[in-house]
Amino acid sequence: MKHVAVIDIGKTNAKLALVESEGLREIAVVTRPNVVLQDGPYPHFGLDGHWQFFLRHLADFQSAHGVDAISVTTHGASIVLLDENGDLATPMLDYEHTGPDTLAAEYDALRPDFSVTGSARLPMGLNVGAQVH
């Protein structure tokens, strides 16, 4: 493997880096703001814009350097739900949205203990289970 394209979706920015696997050196990097949208049922991220950004720059990286593999990294509280066609079923919740806290008592009654999950109970949507609940 020579060049790995790394998709890194962070809270502030979405980034695409092309990394040489031998020396782990970034040879190309592009970023775009990860803006929280306020329309829809709750604060969420604009995934359509990210998709177009990544497609365009992956093609550019392929043309300029070649891409041998793609790796994705993101915050562990970031998820999307897909429908039977593979399309988004719901917008991707901003995991700092306090909406899940309004259902905290119900969720906490169902949530297994840390000794079972290995995951601490966190506020807002920082636990995927709280988002889905």
Spell out what each predicted region is.
Residues 3-47, 87-94:
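Short glycine-rich, Thr/Ser-proximal phosphate-binding strand/loop in the N-terminal lobe
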Residues 29-66, 102-105:
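N-terminal phosphate-binding loop and adjacent alpha-helix
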Residues 59-133:
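Glycine-rich phosphate-binding/catalytic subdomain of phosphoryl-transfer
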